[in-house]
């Protein structure tokens, strides 16, 4: 090896070492970030948020007539950033599990909701709906999981036909009793079929002490993440929570989805400060 080659190799070694240790790639550090508070849309847009994630029940209003949705659609289209994600999914009076599960009503709901979501330009719908999916007392949890998988598998092709990927999210045990961990959520979506995916909610994981390493179980099915700090469900940068244990696992998995801030907003932390704090963590893994 001549001297020039040796010097070139020596100069490259720090970068190669960082890569071997899993240094953050520019692409991962720049993954899209969105907000969930419509009132803050101008601030989101100014701070570089790429999209809004809003609630189906509030914006798509499947239980109301087309003219109501048309007004919402026009207002949403006029906002400075697009609404490309939706969550919430369905009201608690239409149960997806239990002895009174109403799967026909769920399908009727989505046959209104998904075409409307497509008109808005939505690409991902997340099923939270802790009330609708709550396993009733005395009902077998395994049967509830089976029912949940069944209805997800039934409506996922309808979502796909409208250009939408259907996901479920893990919720903590204070909000529901079904799919409260990444592992249980993966079990349900696997049984539901290949058209159902996962939204990993890092806040809910932290509330229930679900380890970051559990995310690896969702490889190939994880397409979206929700983010908030653990104690008060506050925006990143409020208390200073460290999301990097989760972010490292996501990076190592090759995660290429987005991050939605599903959080409250303290006066001390504006959208620009929150996105800067989170981007800093993305860039320093």
Question: Where does each model-flagged region fall?
Answer:
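Glycine-rich, proline-tolerant flexible connector loops at the mouths of alpha/beta enzymes
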Residues: 55-73, 129-136
